[in-house]
């Protein structure tokens, strides 16, 4: 497809003037002059931090591989013309040449933003401010691009033709160019992966579009809105240039599908809590289903009681067989209940410590009372009254023998008492008879 392009004859040695703001020279401002003046005073911590993250900007593009093409900063692009049109000079270019020229024109992020955004608009200033601090030299590059953009628009205004029939013919003959350009642009990297922040925050319809939707898409609507918002743009009819190829319905549908997919994902993520809250609040007549909580595995604390074999044998208590079986069953049931309760290790440890402390206090009280009872029983036995080291078994045996002897003496005394009562009754009856005989 032919393209009418007017080139400015310049030497490649002079291209350094156009990209000079991208480099740092030794004559520029030294931010650490205070440190050079006084070596004893160290720099501030903030200066060290910014010095560590100071990076050079992306180097400029290489010169064109074609000898006839010069730097994209000095290319004035004219509208398309079909083959055989004599209105503009220049020859015809192949698809590879056209893609190379478009790549040079749309190669950098700064140039893309300057094509879409007006350099005098507040959104372009916000784009400069929103960039990270490590992108040094950004403002100088933006200034250079804005100046070159003014020259582009002036050259385009002078070289464009107001013939509407020619614009219609350009629209009809540029479909093949659009297919080649869309095929080449499909291999581009999504700028949202590199820079996830939006280009602007304004909601005006004439502002810049987001980088993932229209910064790299060959859409004529976004470029038309940017040219209308720019004060330097001319009120000429829509004429397609090299940097604004026409769009077809298939491309617009693909872009719309991409935007809809992104919107669906974001809406699904944002509306998930609201849907969950709506499902959590059922109607008044229905039964509410509790929300499904994630499964959390918790460790169960198993209480293990070890016997203290170093304790003296005197502290043990001989329980009866029935009582011992009952206590063992109760202990087993407690262990089973403790195993069923799966709580956090810290809470289970604290509960076990409290239970063990309470159990120790009660056990100590019980042992003290038992010891006092044994001491009292020992004092009642005449044989062991003064024996403080008498074992519990001897105390129990002597106490049993003493009780049996006391019971025998009790029976003897009871029988003697009965005999004495009977004799008293007899003596009393005899006394009554003597009184009656004397009277």
UniProtKB/Swiss-Prot annotation:
<feature type="modified residue" description="N6-acetyllysine; alternate">
    <location>
        <position position="148"/>
    </location>
</feature>
<feature type="modified residue" description="N6-acetyllysine; by PCAF">
    <location>
        <position position="157"/>
    </location>
</feature>
<dbReference type="InterPro" id="IPR012682">
    <property type="entry name" value="Tscrpt_reg_Myc_N"/>
</dbReference>
<dbReference type="GO" id="GO:0005634">
    <property type="term" value="C:nucleus"/>
</dbReference>
<feature type="modified residue" description="N6-acetyllysine; by PCAF; alternate">
    <location>
        <position position="143"/>
    </location>
</feature>
<feature type="modified residue" description="Phosphoserine">
    <location>
        <position position="81"/>
    </location>
</feature>
<dbReference type="GO" id="GO:0044877">
    <property type="term" value="F:protein-containing complex binding"/>
</dbReference>
<dbReference type="GO" id="GO:0032873">
    <property type="term" value="P:negative regulation of stress-activated MAPK cascade"/>
</dbReference>
<dbReference type="GO" id="GO:0051276">
    <property type="term" value="P:chromosome organization"/>
</dbReference>
<keyword id="KW-0007">Acetylation</keyword>
<feature type="modified residue" description="N6-acetyllysine; by PCAF">
    <location>
        <position position="323"/>
    </location>
</feature>
<keyword id="KW-0832">Ubl conjugation</keyword>
<dbReference type="GO" id="GO:0006879">
    <property type="term" value="P:intracellular iron ion homeostasis"/>
</dbReference>
<dbReference type="InterPro" id="IPR002418">
    <property type="entry name" value="Tscrpt_reg_Myc"/>
</dbReference>
<feature type="modified residue" description="Phosphoserine; by PIM2; in vitro">
    <location>
        <position position="329"/>
    </location>
</feature>
<feature type="modified residue" description="Phosphoserine">
    <location>
        <position position="344"/>
    </location>
</feature>
<dbReference type="GO" id="GO:0043066">
    <property type="term" value="P:negative regulation of apoptotic process"/>
</dbReference>
<feature type="domain" description="bHLH">
    <location>
        <begin position="354"/>
        <end position="406"/>
    </location>
</feature>
<dbReference type="GO" id="GO:0045944">
    <property type="term" value="P:positive regulation of transcription by RNA polymerase II"/>
</dbReference>
<feature type="modified residue" description="Phosphoserine">
    <location>
        <position position="159"/>
    </location>
</feature>
<feature type="modified residue" description="Phosphoserine">
    <location>
        <position position="161"/>
    </location>
</feature>
<feature type="compositionally biased region" description="Polar residues">
    <location>
        <begin position="335"/>
        <end position="347"/>
    </location>
</feature>
<dbReference type="GO" id="GO:1904672">
    <property type="term" value="P:regulation of somatic stem cell population maintenance"/>
</dbReference>
<feature type="modified residue" description="Phosphothreonine">
    <location>
        <position position="315"/>
    </location>
</feature>
<dbReference type="GO" id="GO:0045893">
    <property type="term" value="P:positive regulation of DNA-templated transcription"/>
</dbReference>
<feature type="modified residue" description="Phosphoserine; by DYRK2, GSK3 and CDK2">
    <location>
        <position position="62"/>
    </location>
</feature>
<feature type="modified residue" description="Phosphoserine">
    <location>
        <position position="347"/>
    </location>
</feature>
<feature type="modified residue" description="Phosphothreonine; by GSK3; alternate">
    <location>
        <position position="58"/>
    </location>
</feature>
<comment type="function">
    <text>Transcription factor that binds DNA in a non-specific manner, yet also specifically recognizes the core sequence 5'-CAC[GA]TG-3'. Activates the transcription of growth-related genes. Binds to the VEGFA promoter, promoting VEGFA production and subsequent sprouting angiogenesis. Regulator of somatic reprogramming, controls self-renewal of embryonic stem cells. Functions with TAF6L to activate target gene expression through RNA polymerase II pause release.</text>
</comment>
<dbReference type="GO" id="GO:0050679">
    <property type="term" value="P:positive regulation of epithelial cell proliferation"/>
</dbReference>
<dbReference type="GO" id="GO:0000981">
    <property type="term" value="F:DNA-binding transcription factor activity, RNA polymerase II-specific"/>
</dbReference>
<feature type="modified residue" description="N6-acetyllysine; by PCAF">
    <location>
        <position position="275"/>
    </location>
</feature>
<dbReference type="GO" id="GO:0005730">
    <property type="term" value="C:nucleolus"/>
</dbReference>
<feature type="modified residue" description="Phosphoserine">
    <location>
        <position position="293"/>
    </location>
</feature>
<keyword id="KW-0597">Phosphoprotein</keyword>
<keyword id="KW-0325">Glycoprotein</keyword>
<feature type="modified residue" description="Phosphoserine">
    <location>
        <position position="348"/>
    </location>
</feature>
<keyword id="KW-0805">Transcription regulation</keyword>
<feature type="region of interest" description="Disordered">
    <location>
        <begin position="334"/>
        <end position="364"/>
    </location>
</feature>
<dbReference type="GO" id="GO:0006338">
    <property type="term" value="P:chromatin remodeling"/>
</dbReference>
<comment type="subunit">
    <text>Efficient DNA binding requires dimerization with another bHLH protein. Binds DNA as a heterodimer with MAX. Interacts with TAF1C and SPAG9. Interacts with PARP10. Interacts with KDM5A and KDM5B. Interacts (when phosphorylated at Thr-58 and Ser-62) with FBXW7. Interacts with PIM2. Interacts with RIOX1. The heterodimer MYC:MAX interacts with ABI1; the interaction may enhance MYC:MAX transcriptional activity. Interacts with TRIM6. Interacts with NPM1; the binary complex is recruited to the promoter of MYC target genes and enhances their transcription.</text>
</comment>
<keyword id="KW-0656">Proto-oncogene</keyword>
């Amino acid at each position: 497809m032919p393209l009418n392009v007017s080139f400015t004859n310049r030497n490649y040695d002079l291209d350094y003037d156009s990209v000079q703001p991208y480099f740092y020279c030794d004559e520029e401002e030294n931010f650490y002059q205070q440190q050079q003046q006084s070596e004893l005073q160290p720099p501030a911590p903030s200066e060290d931090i910014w010095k560590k993250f100071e990076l050079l900007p992306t180097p400029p593009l290489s010169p064109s591989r074609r000898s006839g093409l010069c730097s994209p900063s000095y290319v004035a692009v004219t509208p398309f013309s079909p083959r055989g049109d004599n209105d503009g000079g220049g020859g015809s270019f192949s698809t590879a040449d056209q893609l190379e020229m478009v790549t040079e024109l749309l190669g950098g992020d700064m140039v893309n933003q300057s094509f879409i955004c007006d350099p005098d608009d507040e959104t372009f200033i916000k784009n400069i401010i929103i960039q990270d601090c490590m992108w040094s030299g950004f403002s100088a590059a933006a200034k250079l691009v804005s100046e070159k953009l003014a020259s582009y628009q002036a050259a385009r205004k002078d070289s464009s033709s107001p013939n509407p029939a020619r614009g219609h013919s350009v629209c009809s003959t540029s479909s093949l160019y659009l297919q080649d350009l869309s095929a080449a642009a499909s291999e581009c990297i999504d700028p949202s992966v590199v820079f996830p922040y939006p280009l602007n925050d304004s909601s005006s319809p004439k502002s810049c579009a987001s980088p993932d939707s229209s910064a790299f898409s060959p859409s004529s609507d976004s470029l038309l809105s940017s040219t209308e918002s720019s004060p330097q743009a001319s009120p000429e009819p829509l004429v397609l240039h090299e940097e604004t190829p026409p769009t077809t319905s298939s491309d617009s549908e693909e872009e719309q599908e991409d935007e809809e997919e992104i919107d669906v994902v974001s809406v699904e993520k944002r509306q998930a809590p609201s849907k969950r809250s709506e499902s959590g609040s059922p109607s008044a007549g229905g039964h509410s289903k509790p929300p499904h909580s994630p499964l959390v595995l918790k460790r169960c604390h198993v209480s293990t009681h070890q016997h203290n074999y170093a304790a003296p044998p005197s502290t043990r208590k001989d329980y009866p067989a029935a009582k011992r079986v009952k206590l063992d069953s109760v202990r087993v049931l407690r262990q089973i209940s403790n195993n069923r309760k799966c709580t956090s290790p810290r809470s289970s440890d604290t509960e076990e410590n409290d239970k063990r402390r309470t159990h120790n206090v009660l056990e100590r009280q019980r042992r003290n009372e038992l010891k006092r009872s044994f001491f009292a029983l020992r004092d009642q036995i005449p044989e062991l009254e003064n024996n403080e080291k008498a074992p519990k078994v001897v105390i129990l045996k002597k106490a049993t023998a003493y009780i049996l002897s006391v019971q025998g003496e009790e029976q003897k005394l009871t029988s003697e008492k009965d005999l004495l009562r009977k004799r008293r009754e007899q003596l009393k009856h005899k006394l009554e008879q003597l009184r009656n005989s004397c009277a």
